[in-house]
Amino acid sequence: MSIWAIGDLQGCYDATQRLLENIRFDPSQDTLWFCGDLVNRGGQSLETLRLVYSLRSHSVVVLGNHDLSLLAIAVRSEEEQRKVNPDLLRIITAEDRDEILTWLRMQKLIHVDRTIGWMMVHAGLAPKWTTQMAEKLAHEVEQQLHGADYRNLLHSMYGDKPEWSPALSGCNRSRAIINVLTRMRYCTPRGRISTEDKGTPGTQTQGMYPWFEVPGRVERDLKIVCGHWSTLGLTITQGIHAIDTGAVWGGKLTALQIDTDELRLAQVHGLSIEHPRHTHTPRRQAKKHSKK
């Protein structure tokens, strides 16, 4: 049995299929961990979503910011829905949309497997959040998303503020938790997120740090695998394994086997487009699997 964590798919269906062939995925014994952002930009979001849905008995999904945006679009008026990009509109108008989107809404914001010592989150954790605290806070939002009043959450989750504080309540608290778990790249030691800084480390605003390098951050008892930050590139450092390698931007789609002591890496080429972006060299290289 193998457990493979897979970076942001973003509607890159063909690349996803090639990657599953590359790792010789066997649904009878293997498990896939999808790091979120299954949809948007890749042009085949409906096909990608259907594929992951078909693998639901053999996979775990955490929601990314694009997945949450899709769910929010689905509860808007038809007039507003017509304004979204064609890739997402195909999902909204699909015959099986209710079945697929209900399944998507029931997914987690954080997944933990303490038997192998790993946590999966789309973006990151606030500096003072232990893994136990992050699980608890994620569960708060998941309960709302899975409940009867989920539309209220989807309507109120947008906005860059407030910054996280334990004293927050209501929609402000939920929004702050969602922003940390699905949107964060850089933050201050106090946990204030920068939504403007999206480039490689060294290009950010003064006083901002990559979330996994913030001074004074708590020690964590689990290894973490995440996606979201394509300009960071493959980065393995201090128990953090960032595997969004920009498949939708002409980069690669990455899978990382996490149930063995020696990490194994598999990659396939993503979309054949050029997108101006910086690269970031991994600080520790995982063992490479065969490439296609």
UniProtKB/Swiss-Prot annotation:
What does the organism's lineage look like at the top? Answer: Bacteria, Pseudomonadati, Pseudomonadota, Gammaproteobacteria, Lysobacterales
Catalyzed reactions per annotation: P(1),P(4)-bis(5'-adenosyl) tetraphosphate + H2O = 2 ADP + 2 H(+)
Record-listed E.C. numbers: 3.6.1.41
User: Which SUPFAM superfamilies does the record associate with it?
Assistant: Metallo-dependent phosphatases (SSF56300)
Q: Which organism is it from?
A: Xylella fastidiosa (strain 9a5c)
| Highest rank taxon of the organism | Bacteria
In this chain, the stretch annotated as Disordered covers 271-292
Q: HAMAP family, from UniProt?
A: ApaH (MF_00199)
Entry keywords, A to Z: Hydrolase
Family designation: Belongs to the Ap4A hydrolase family.
Q: List, in alphabetical order, the Gene Ontology terms for molecular function in this entry.
A: bis(5'-nucleosyl)-tetraphosphatase (symmetrical) activity
Annotated gene: apaH
Q: What does this protein do?
A: Hydrolyzes diadenosine 5',5'''-P1,P4-tetraphosphate to yield ADP.
- Identify this protein by name: Bis(5'-nucleosyl)-tetraphosphatase, symmetrical
Where does the record place Basic residues bias? 277-292
